[in-house]
Amino acid sequence: MKIVTFNLRCAWRGDGINSFIHRAGLIYEKIMAERPSVVAFQEVIPASLEVLKRLLPEYEFFGGMRTEQYDGEGLYTALRKEDTTLLGGEVFWLSPTPYIAGSRFEEQSIFPRVGIYTRVLCKQTGEVLSIFNLHLDHLSTEAAQKGLACTVAYIREHRGYVDADKALILGDFNVTPDSPALSPLREEAWLYDATEGITTTFHAFGKRRDAKIDYIFLSEAMRGRVTAVAPWQDEHAGIYLSDHFPVCLSLT
C-alpha cells in the first residue's frame, strides 16, 4: 500500500499558473495513476476540499478546520475505499488544551494547529493503522516542538486503541532535519524517520531545492516493510502538484 503526505498549498490567486485551479487536474491525474491508499492533505480550505471530493469519489475524507469557528484552513486525510475502512478518528488541537477548538501554545503564531488522527483498517492485510496528520507552526520552533510532543502524548494516553507498533506521524512539520523541534520524535526509540534520505520537499514551485520540511515517521516495527520512499516531483509546462513535493511511502 502507498501512504502519502501532501501539502496542497492554499488556493492563492497570486500563484499564477500554479494557482490551485490550474493544479487540480494534475493532482487528480497523479492520484489516479498512483492509487495511494492514504493521502494526508495539509493546507486544505473549503473550496479545495469540495474540488477534491468531486474529483476523488473513490476516497473518503476525514479531518477538520483549525479555528474556533471550525473554518479557514485545515487538514484532511483521504482513504481509498477499495483498500481501507475508516474505523474512527479525532481532531485535536496542538496546544495545552487539545479539546478546546482554536487553542494554541503561547509561543505560537496567530494560527491554531490541529492534528488529525485516523484509525484505518487495511482490507488486504486486516491490520489497523493509526495515522496522525500534522501541520506544525511555521514561525516558532518551540511551538512546533510542543506540537510533536503533544502528538506523542496523545499516543501514550490512548494506548487502549492506538497501537504504537502500527502508528505513523506524518505531514508538514515546517522545520528542517537539524531542528531541535524534531526531538520529541527522535527521542522515541520506537519511531524512525522514513524520509531520512530525502533532501528536498519544499521547492516554492521550482524556485528552490534546499528545504526538507515534510516527513513520515513510523514505528520501528514496520521498518522492514518499507519498500520505497520518494517525493512526487511531477511538473507539466511549469505547473507543479504543489509548492511542496508530496512524499509517498510504500509498504508491503
Per-segment meaning from a language model:
Residues 1-55, 66-73, 129, 148-149:
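N-terminal, active-site-proximal structural segment of metallo-dependent hydrolase catalytic domains
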Residues 114-123, 128-132, 144-170, 182:
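His/acidic metal-ligating clusters that form di-metal
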Residues 156-167, 174-252:
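Metal-dependent phosphoester-hydrolase catalytic domains
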